[in-house]
Regions:
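A structural signal for small-residue-enriched, beta-sheet-centric alpha/beta enzyme cores
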Residues: 1-16, 49, 115-117, 121-183
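Alpha/propeptide regions of enzymes that mature by internal proteolysis
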Residues: 18-98, 162-183
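Glycine-rich anion/phosphate-binding loop at the beta-strand->alpha-helix junction
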Residues: 67-148, 152, 162
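Short glycine-rich, polar/acidic loop-and-turn segments at beta strand-coil junctions
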Residues: 13-15, 36, 102
């Protein structure tokens, strides 16, 4: 587990990567923080962000995910950090799992069954999905209006989305969750 400010990553790999993970968190958070300093409205945007010219890749991924899902770019921030840190960690290991507040970047040689935490719902940890990520990394992201501290405009206990893009999975889970107004 490696924590830097609001970013709290659980990393599982074939060897210890804590120091490298900390450096990567600082690198990718730095890109986001610097962009927010020059575009402060980015932080609170709840609508898709219009392209404002050149930006770091992590920002471009967040913007693209938000545009595709119909949400603001920060709806993709946890998935984007998990994805970019995870992709960089693959330079040091062939398998890695990076979890960031329910958003997971996964690259493993063997299938993994993931349970879905849905708070006090009777379905919590009673459902799972077998994820295969041998050929390419996969993003598995969960959004909730009843569990955790992230902003959700809906009431879903858990919305789980699987995608090639962890950023897009995060934004899509948020978007779907925002639409569910009653249980």
């Amino acid at each position: 587990r490696v924590a830097v400010q609001e970013t709290d990553l659980y990393v599982q790999a074939l060897k210890p990567l804590e120091d490298i993970t900390r450096e990567l968190i600082l690198k990718h958070r730095g890109y986001i923080e610097k962009y927010i300093k020059t575009h402060p409205e980015f932080l609170d945007a709840l609508e898709p962000w219009r392209d404002r010219g050149p930006a770091p890749v992590i920002i471009c991924d967040m913007v693209s995910a938000g545009q595709k899902a119909g949400v603001g770019p920060m709806a993709a921030v946890a998935g984007a950090i998990a994805e970019h840190v995870g992709a960089d960690l693959l330079k040091y290991t062939v398998e890695v799992v990076v979890e960031n507040g329910g958003d997971i970047f996964l690259k493993t040689d063997n299938p993994v069954t993931m349970g879905i935490v849905a708070g006090t719902s009777s379905l919590s940890m009673r459902m799972g999905r077998c994820i295969k990520s041998k050929e390419k990394p996969v993003g598995v992201c969960t959004s909730s209006g009843t569990v955790g501290h992230s902003l959700s405009l809906g009431k879903a206990d858990a919305i789980c989305v699987v995608s090639d893009s962890c950023s897009l999975a995060d934004a899509a889970a948020t978007s779907i969750g925002n639409r569910l107004k009653s249980k």
